[in-house]
Amino acid sequence: LPGMWAYRAWQNGSQFVHFSTDAVFDGSSADLYSEDDATGAPSVYGQTKRAGEEAVLSANPDALVLRTNFFGWSNDRARGILDFFANGLESGVLMTGFRDYVVSSVYVGHLFELLIEALSAEGSGIYHLVSSSPLSKYDFGVALAHAMGADADLIEPGLLADNLALSDRGHHLGLSVDKLEALVGHPIP
């Protein structure tokens, strides 16, 4: 479907934006992934997102494909990583944060500001729209605790590798924002 939608946009002369994910990478590199690095998603989710990227760019070479990993509040404050940690910190519940799962999550408000900038700069092709500072899920939770004035000791360090239910995820999915910074003309926070 994404390829079909991208083609229709191209026929109409409309800009097409496709959101993808950091999960297109296998997560085995300690370095930040660039847009040109080989993908190799271990999960069906990442594989299908990569197939969507390819279909979109094949159908519409002017399309903007944004690989992202974002956080924000869900409508019911019960679905995302921000909700998980904030609710636990407010309730005084012990939680586990994975030290070996590193991502470049961007706040959803910043994501949309950067989307507008990328569109205004007439970007096309693949860009990484994420934070410039990768964090482990543990470090994310601790940073949130400090921002909330909550007890960071409620977050215990754990390992994704010990959680068999999540074993198909790459462990280091930090993405480079160099290409996006060049497009928008300023550093990405």
Please give the residue ranges for each predicted region.
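Conserved internal alpha-helix within the Rossmann fold of NAD(P)-dependent oxidoreductases
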Residues: 2-5, 53, 115
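Mid/C-terminal beta-alpha module of Rossmann-like enzyme folds, strongest
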Residues: 114, 121-172
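Glycine-rich Rossmann NAD(P)(H)-binding loop
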Residues: 74, 96-102, 127-135, 183
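Helix C-cap/helix->beta junction micro-motif
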Residues: 8-12, 59, 148
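Catalytic helix-loop patch of NAD(P)-dependent Rossmann-fold dehydrogenases
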Residues: 15, 24-66, 70-72
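NAD(P)-cofactor binding segment of oxidoreductase domains
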Residues: 1-17
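NAD(P)-dependent short-chain dehydrogenase/reductase
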Residues: 54-103, 108-110
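C-terminal amphipathic/interface module of NAD(P)-dependent oxidoreductases
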Residues: 153, 168-189
